[in-house]
Amino acid sequence: MSINQYSSDFHYHSLMWQQQQQQQQHQNDVVEEKEALFEKPLTPSDVGKLNRLVIPKQHAERYFPLAAAAADAVEKGLLLCFEDEEGKPWRFRYSYWNSSQSYVLTKGWSRYVKEKHLDAGDVVLFHRHRSDGGRFFIGWRRRGDSSSSSDSYRHVQSNASLQYYPHAGAQAVESQRGNSKTLRLFGVNMECQLDSDWSEPSTPDGSNTYTTNHDQFHFYPQQQHYPPPYYMDISFTGDMNRTS
């Protein structure tokens, strides 16, 4: 593989890191703007063939009041719009069933259940924007789990790691401090942290030769071309000779 290909891969991973950081920041901003409204544990009928979710009466009348809507809207129902943990919009038909005297979400609910793989015992979470009272959010939590779908999404984003595994193209630079070395990789000085028990064997002619067979090095960029911190595990195969 050519040096240009390695350089392109390095740039690609750097862009991916930046995008993940932007998504993480957006997610944090959204969470800070949310105000918890209520939670609804799902019953078997909520995820069954009735294709509807029953909203507890006290929560329905407090947060989604139909009394303020027009008479025809009360009969036909309203469209309630929500955003999920990824910012995807969801629209549900919201109405009052006289037969069961209950407030329900109908159209659109079965698709949400299917996409999120919800089962009886799981919990649906409802939130509202702190400054925009007409903006609602919907999330979910698995049965017996203390973290919500939003928490899980942020956890994956914050722990997403980018790894880079070149096998060539590194050039040694005459710089060493303690058990660390500096390598120059594609024009970027990288500090290499060596294991404490690592040593370089000497040859009869006085030169130092080291052979690494999948030895692990940890590199940290010394320039600001790429967003720090940028962790890379780089494995070298083959022999590299450096003369003193």
From Swiss-Prot:
Keyword Cell membrane (UniProt): no
This protein's UniProt keywords: DNA-binding, Nucleus, Transcription, Transcription regulation
DNA-binding region, residues: 38-144
Location within or outside the cell: Nucleus
Entry GO terms, CC: nucleus
Gene Ontology BP annotations: negative regulation of DNA-templated transcription
Highest taxon of the lineage: Eukaryota
Pfam families per record: B3
InterPro entries assigned to the protein according to its UniProt record, in alphabetical order: B3_DNA-bd (IPR003340), DNA-bd_pseudobarrel_sf (IPR015300), LEC2-like (IPR044800)
Gene Ontology molecular function, alphabetical: DNA-binding transcription factor activity; transcription cis-regulatory region binding
Name of the protein: B3 domain-containing protein At2g36080
